[in-house]
Amino acid sequence: MSKKRLHEIAKEIGKTSKEVVEKAKSLGLDVKSHASSVSEEDAKKIVSTFTEKPKTETKPKIKAVDETPKPKLEAVKEEVKVEKTQTVQETVNPTVARPKSRNFKAEREARAKEQAARQKRNAQESTERRQDNRYQQKNDQGSKNRNFNKSQGQAKDRRFDAKGSQQNNRQDSRIASNKPNHNDKFNAANRNQNNSQQERQVGAARIDFKARAAALKAEQNAEYMRHKETQLREQEEARRLAERAKEEARLAAQKAAEEKAKEAEKAAKTERFEPKSAVASTVAPEAVKPVDKRRKKARPEKSYEDQSSNENGPKQNKKSWNNQNQVRNQRNSNWNKKPKKGKNAKNNTVAPKPVTERKFHELPKEFEYTEGMTVVEIAKRIKREPAEIVKKLFMMGVMATQNQSLDGDTIELLMVDYGIEAKEKVQVDDADIERFFEDDTYLNPDKLVERAPVVTIMGHVDHGKTTLLDTLRNSRVATGEAGGITQHIGAYQIEEAGKKITFLDTPGHAAFTSMRARGASVTDITILIVAADDGVMPQTIEAINHSKAAEVPIIVAINKIDKPGANPERVISELAEHGIISTAWGGDSEFVEISAKFNKNIDELLETVLLVAEVEELKADPTVRAIGTVIEARLDKGKGAVATLLVQQGTLHVQDPIVIGNTFGRVRAMTNDLGRRVKVAPPSTPVSITGLNETPMAGDHFAVYEDEKAARAAGEERAKRALLKQRQNTQRVSLDNLFDTLKAGEIKTVNVIIKADVQGSVEALAASLLKIEVEGVRVNVVHSAVGAINESDVTLAEASNAVIIGFNVRPTPQARQQAETDDVEIRLHSIIYKVIEEVEEAMKGKLDPEYKEKILGEAVIRETFKVSKVGTIGGFMVLSGKITRDSNVRVIRDSVVIFDGKLASLKHYKDDVKEVGNAQEGGLMIEKFNDLQVDDNIEAYIMEEIVRK
């Protein structure tokens, strides 16, 4: 459906766009301006509203105009009245009466109306001729359209007859309901054409656009003059008010000056007997300045708008500017300059803005400060100006600027001067992770739940510790899981009676000691395993001492009760001597007799562990952010830094920002002891994580932070402190410990791990290796045990950079594979002295080699040859020995060595040779030396390595 714009409709019906827009709004149409579009039906409605009303009103008026022609001026007035009566119901701008004082305007309007009346008659005749031509063209076009529509209708009837009756009925009903009949449309079109023709004829006879334009212009001029008069009255009123205010201010100042003069005179009279009375009486009147009334004379102030305004007419078109002084040329560049603004303006009547008074703020009663606050920060806190504080500090003897930091004492003195109580703010060190392990006030007491105990098995070598761990791992870990453990991460969990127990697979008590040294008391219960046939051994006593230092309960597992020589009672009595007393004897330590090899009483041992854990009341809060300890850490080629963590409090989630030791990162992936991916790790759960930027140390604490930014800041701060501490702990060499330091730095060690078939062989081999004496090197037995070489031995050897020595034993397939992967050397022997020789050779290999100089021969230069782009060639004769191609040479001149280097080339005549023998001649070139002279001596030598004994 085509649309029409409102200004097109207004042009067709001879109305203004504003009237058409208002009429469309009155009909409820959504239009905004003359450019809005409406449909054809809405356009017809708008046209009909304008055409229906004037039919009865305009005809007699048109006839009256035709029958009795009136004078031109009266005809124009009557047409204006007709237009007013027609637009009573419409919304138009009200006409304003012209001011009577402006006679020249009435004359100008009359002349304009007369001219419009003359033009009207001429335009009316031409308009009628154009309309007749247009109507004739439309009638011709309408006949063509009717013939075409008639043929189209016949074709459509033929198509409709070919379709089914149901479609015809539906089509007929739709046509009947929505669209009028074709004949009705044609008749309506003819009626609309006739109506529009009549309207145009009426409009042509009724509307005079130029007369209306003249009337509208007159109304606009009248409106402009009223606005100008109002503006002038307001300006005049503003000037009167300003003058009145100035006069009042002048009178008030004059009155105040007079009162001050009277007071001065009165004071002078009361003090006339004093010696200074005369001076006072003469000085007081001088304070009153005479008022210059000439400067206060009221002068007419003209604004910029007054320059172009006239009292008897509208605004002039700047004709007064085109004078001799306002020529636009190079000599006068200010021809279009606007009046000045600001304090230099001559006619500035705008009163200055009053200065806003600063609000008074009371001082706070307390002030919480931090060390290093600046003056500006303090000023903002106490609502004072920084300059005021700087002044106070200056009076206190402290020279400071606004951005200078102040110490705590200065801030306290400043607050005392202001009368404010100063308190230092207690700052929490975000980089301190240890506070979470020392203070548990951050935990929620009402959300504490029971957690699984963390157990460490300790004991002497060959007492069954490894066997017990293997038994627990194979029989209890992942019951019902296919494949069992798929990844060994140094810690694992077992389940007994519906409760979990976490075991730490640490390589002996050494790792436990290193953890304790870092303050990581991760163990809740210690299982001390003692062999029933051996009893208490030295390492057993050491394990007892470590457990007591960690303040953890001890459960004694007496192993190997299946052996014939087992004597559990002797073990109980020996342990009682070291402070481990059984509950049967009135002590607090539980004793369990087991056989790890045959899986005997293992259930009873686990029940005892759960009983002790229940007595200890191990609790944890899973709602807080996770903290814990690093069990193991390694650098994987594909994953990067991998750390095995034990969660002690809170719950660890994937994507948590974490700080571990002196490093930080985000938990990218997390796997449990079965090697499966998990997203959540509750308390007492061992997990392996990735996503750290560096590899942490075993035993380091970790904590989860609220966001990655805080974690990064804490990690970087901890790394900075660790580096500073390392530099501070650097021992400086003094004269007292100079030689001790040199000796300690020179001594090197060879780390070995000994595994043998029997205990006697282990002790004998360890004693023999410790007796080997090589200057500057010593043997360090990292670990010695009985049995085959297993995975734990390979792991320990990799961590300590040790060599595994197997005496009459072989490594397991898993250990051999791990040794190849970790590049750990395994030496297998069956004769003890071969072991000693091999270790001795390794110890000698640790020493730095010693070299001795050996003179090969001497020669003398007989002639020199300088070759461009090559250098100086020396012809020589061998005096003694020989000169070889790979030997070092010294150039000696007058018994002084002037150069020491290597040969670049050696020739015998024209052939390159490897050596030149005694009494032979040859030629040579020396690398980076071209200053050979005749009679220079050449000494050839080599450095030989001395065998260390």
From Swiss-Prot:
Signal peptide region: none
Annotated stretches, region: Disordered: 50-206, 220-359
Domain tr-type G: 450-619
Segments for region (G2): 484-488
Chain sites annotated for binding GTP: 459-466, 505-509, 559-562
Keyword set includes GTP-binding: yes
Composition bias, Polar residues: 144-154, 164-180
A GO cellular-component term linked to this record: cytosol
Localization per Swiss-Prot or TrEMBL: Cytoplasm
Listed InterPro entries: EF-G-like_DII (IPR053905), IF2_II (IPR044145), IF2_N (IPR006847), P-loop_NTPase (IPR027417), Small_GTP-bd (IPR005225), T_Tr_GTP-bd_dom (IPR000795), TF_IF2_bacterial-like (IPR000178), TIF_IF2 (IPR015760)
UniProt-listed CDD domains: IF2_eIF5B (cd01887), IF2_mtIF2_II (cd03702), mtIF2_IVc (cd03692)
Composition skew (Basic and acidic residues), residue ranges: 52-84, 104-143, 224-275
GO molecular function: GTP binding; GTPase activity; translation initiation factor activity
Region: G1, residue numbers: 459-466
Region of interest called G5, as start-end residue ranges on this chain: 595-597
Alphabetical list of Pfam families matching this protein: EF-G_D2, GTP_EFTU, IF-2, IF2_N
Region spans: G3: 505-508
Biased composition (Low complexity): 187-206, 319-336
Record keywords, A-Z: Cytoplasm, GTP-binding, Initiation factor, Nucleotide-binding, Protein biosynthesis
Family named by the database record: Belongs to the TRAFAC class translation factor GTPase superfamily. Classic translation factor GTPase family. IF-2 subfamily.
Function: One of the essential components for the initiation of protein synthesis. Protects formylmethionyl-tRNA from spontaneous hydrolysis and promotes its binding to the 30S ribosomal subunits. Also involved in the hydrolysis of GTP during the formation of the 70S ribosomal complex.
Protein name: Translation initiation factor IF-2
Organism for this UniProt entry: Streptococcus uberis (strain ATCC BAA-854 / 0140J)
Protein's gene: infB
